[in-house]
Design a protein with these regions (language model features):
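Short, basic, glycine/proline-bearing loop/turn elements
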Residues: 17, 92-99, 126-129
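Catalytic core of membrane glycerolipid acyltransferases/transacylases, capturing the structured
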Residues: 38-102
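Non-catalytic C-terminal accessory region of glycerolipid acyltransferases
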Residues: 5, 106-268
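Short, flexible loop segments at the rims of nucleotide/cofactor-binding pockets, characterized by
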Residues: 17-25, 50, 98-102, 133, ...
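Well-ordered alpha-helical segments embedded in enzymatic catalytic cores
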Residues: 28, 58, 107-111
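Short hydrophobic helices that act as membrane-entry/anchoring signals
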Residues: 3-22, 91
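Helix-to-loop junction immediately C-terminal to a conserved catalytic motif
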Residues: 15-50
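Conserved beta-strand scaffold positions in the cores of enzyme catalytic domains, especially
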Residues: 26, 73, 96-98, 154-156, ...
Length: 268
């Protein structure tokens, strides 16, 4: 009964709210087509960057079939579950699972592993919390750890634009445009430990972020040349860091204009 109610809520109010506020454009679904056909893979770990509380309903609506019907979102316990009514709504509408932003308890980890073992998929924000300044944060190893322990693949995801809609410190949301880019699934390799696999996940999300700024081929060329923009931004702080973010967004605006101008050649 709860799943039936959740389907109605996601298809109706949740999707309506996301479309109204974010007008999302979802890309990269084709990169998951082979994974969807594999009968030896059950639960999947989706690992997006995190800029806004809007990210949680956004991911609930953006994750494609066959995973969206059995999807749990690891959500901040101190925000989504700070009040009983809010927690009930989050659990029912978003299938949100309360998790501590800073440290994942043994109990939470075991429960997530059990869900993955039962072919449920999980959304985990590796940064552990929302961006405080528009740049990303270093990834924590929760997604990598769960993947290594369960064998579940990690799908890197880059979300672009939610920080401008309802970023940290904003009192109320405002409308904007959002892109959600799914990357190719990552499996832990034989010699991977949690640290190395976590670095691969962060690198994959960084590449998707550069793809969002430019385009697929430009981002790969920049990565090969070692010129990808770091997800965490420059190491310095203060106005220089904010200025770099401004320049970073100018690059993204230029990339968007290039994509809009691109047309298929006339072969007639």
């Amino acid at each position: 009964a709860a799943r039936a109610v959740r389907r109605i809520l996601v298809a109706g109010p949740v999707t309506g709210m996301v479309k109204f506020l974010a007008r999302p454009k979802v890309e990269g679904i084709d990169r998951l087509s082979d994974l969807a056909k594999r009968t030896d893979v059950g639960g999947v770990i989706f690992a997006p960057n995190h800029h806004s509380h809007i990210d949680t309903p956004l991911m609930t609506t953006a994750v494609p079939s066959p995973w969206n019907d059995r999807l749990v979102v690891a959500a901040a316990a101190d925000y989504f579950f700070d009040k009983r009514t809010k927690g009930t709504i989050a659990a029912l509408a978003l299938n949100a699972f309360p998790i501590d932003r800073e440290t994942t308890s043994r109990k939470s980890s075991d429960e997530l592993r059990a869900l993955l073992a039962r072919d449920w998929s999980v959304v985990i924000y590796p940064e552990g919390g929302r961006s405080p300044d528009g740049w990303g944060q270093d990834f924590k190893a929760g997604a990598a750890y769960l993947s290594i322990k369960t064998g579940s693949p990690v799908v890197p995801v880059f979300i672009d634009g939610t920080g401008s809609i309802f970023g940290k410190g904003m009192k109320r949301p405002r409308r904007g445009h959002v892109r959600v880019i799914f990357g190719a699934p990552l499996f832990p390799e034989e010699n991977d430990n949690t640290r190395r696999f976590n670095e691969r996940i962060e690198k994959a999300v960084t590449l998707l972020g550069d793809e969002s700024l430019t385009d697929f081929w430009t981002s790969r060329q920049r990565a090969a040349a070692g010129r990808s923009t770091a997800l965490t931004g420059p190491e310095y702080s203060g106005w220089r860091r904010q200025w770099s973010l401004y320049e970073h967004r100018k690059l993204g605006a230029a990339g968007q204009r290039r994509r809009q101008k691109r047309r298929w050649p006339n072969l007639g």
